[in-house]
């Protein structure tokens, strides 16, 4: 097979980039190791920044998001058993977030690509990327039936996530910056209407808790736990009891319902510099991981491809390589801003085994809920910086 841009990974980064390039007449092939049903059912992030929403609208894939997504104008911070609303729209000139599950966005992008009749190959694993320092890099592929094939490209985009082959190849020649946090999240998806129409970030003596939502009938809730937490040790009843304790305030009740799924999410930060090796460029989780507290992972993936798409077009149409040459530097400036914000939110909201740090972060949160200037800074970062 031959194409101009080979895209490894059919997640938000890969599919959004394919859509942006499609609208400019650039030929692409997207390969995905998993099945269509798997990527369309995988529950992940659900908070879209203003810039992400605007880009998806401009790309012609925002219709269902606009119809079904939940627009939020603020979030709630809870400390010392009291709630404080952070009015993001008022603090940022009207900018908002939209709650719309990543799996729903993936469904929209897959449907748009298939409707265009463009190449999207599921159950096709990229086993290696070769000739990356030449003008004809190749992706070596293995189909579900075990047969092998090759995809020759002008450029390869590694959007196959943290565990994909693309990151491994770039990391071997990059600096990798990492931080592991001393806590994790025990998350549940519950079949119950949300008990609040905005996200609640609660700091409690027992640990952090988050009340979130995926739809008017589905709630997403999290508890701070240890990285090696034994999920089997938690019954559904124990999970609800602890959520009631950490999220509870006078005069408010957390509605309970059947737990549909649960899991433990580790907290880590990872950045690979540069996000490029020859004709291979990384986007999304292949290049960086952030803790989920700041709701930045999906939005960074979209920001990466917003930066990358015009540079690819310039390179292929005009043989202009300077844009590709500075892609990593430009993207990483945004990545490190998001890392800083995510780190700040994570430490401020979680109980810390370091007693001094724990007290310091409690003081930080109390300051935030009492200071408009501090709230404005958080709001600007939460709704997202302008896309390039």
Model-derived features with residue positions:
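C-terminal helical "tail/cap" subdomain of flavin- and related membrane-associated enzymes
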Residues: 295, 310-388
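Active-site-adjacent segment of FAD-dependent monooxygenases/related oxidoreductases
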Residues: 41-44, 49-116, 339
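Glycine-rich FAD pyrophosphate-binding loop
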Residues: 22-43
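FAD-binding beta-loop-beta segment adjacent to the flavin cofactor pocket
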Residues: 266-282
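Conserved FAD-binding catalytic core of PHBH/FMO-like flavoproteins
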Residues: 111, 118, 124-128, 133-263, ...
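Glycine-rich phosphate/pyrophosphate-binding beta-alpha loops
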Residues: 208, 269-271, 287-298
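Beta1/beta-strand and adjacent pyrophosphate-binding region of the FAD-binding site
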Residues: 1-13
């Amino acid at each position: 097979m031959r194409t101009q841009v080979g895209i490894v990974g059919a997640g938000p980064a890969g599919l959004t980039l394919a859509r942006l390039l499609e609208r400019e007449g650039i030929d692409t092939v997207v390969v995905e190791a998993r099945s269509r049903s798997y990527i369309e059912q995988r529950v992940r992030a659900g908070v879209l920044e203003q810039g992400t929403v605007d880009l998806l609208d401009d790309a012609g894939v925002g219709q269902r998001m606009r119809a079904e997504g939940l627009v939020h104008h603020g979030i709630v911070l809870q400390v010392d058993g009291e709630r404080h609303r952070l009015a993001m729209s008022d603090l940022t000139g009207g900018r908002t977030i939209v709650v719309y599950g990543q799996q729903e966005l993936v469904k929209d992008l897959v449907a748009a690509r298939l409707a265009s009749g463009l190449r999207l190959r599921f159950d096709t694993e990229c086993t290696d990327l070769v000739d990356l320092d030449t003008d004809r890099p190749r992706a070596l592929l293995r189909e579900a039936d075990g047969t092998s094939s090759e995809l020759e490209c002008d450029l390869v985009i590694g959007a196959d996530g943290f565990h994909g082959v693309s990151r491994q190849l770039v990391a071997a020649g990059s600096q990798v910056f990492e931080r592991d946090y001393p806590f994790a999240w025990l998350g549940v998806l519950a079949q119950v209407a949300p008990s609040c129409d905005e996200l609640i970030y609660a700091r409690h003596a027992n640990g952090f808790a988050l009340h979130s939502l995926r739809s008017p009938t589905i709630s997403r809730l999290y508890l701070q736990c240890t990285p090696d937490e034994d999920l089997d040790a938690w019954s559904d009843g124990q999970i609800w009891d602890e959520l009631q304790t950490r999220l509870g305030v006078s005069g408010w009740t957390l509605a309970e319902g059947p737990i549909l799924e649960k899991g433990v999410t580790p907290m880590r930060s990872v950045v690979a510099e540069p996000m490029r090796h020859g004709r291979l460029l990384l986007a999304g989780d292949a290049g960086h991981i952030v803790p989920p507290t700041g709701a930045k992972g999906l939005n960074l993936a979209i920001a990466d491809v917003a930066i990358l798409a015009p540079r690819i077009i310039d390179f292929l149409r005009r043989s202009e390589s300077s844009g590709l040459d500075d892609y990593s530097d430009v993207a990483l400036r945004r990545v490190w801003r998001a890392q800083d914000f995510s780190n700040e939110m994570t430490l401020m909201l979680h109980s810390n085994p370091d007693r001094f740090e724990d007290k310091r972060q409690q003081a930080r949160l109390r300051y935030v809920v009492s200071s408009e200037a501090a709230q404005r800074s958080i709001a600007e970062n939460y709704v997202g910086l302008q896309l390039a």
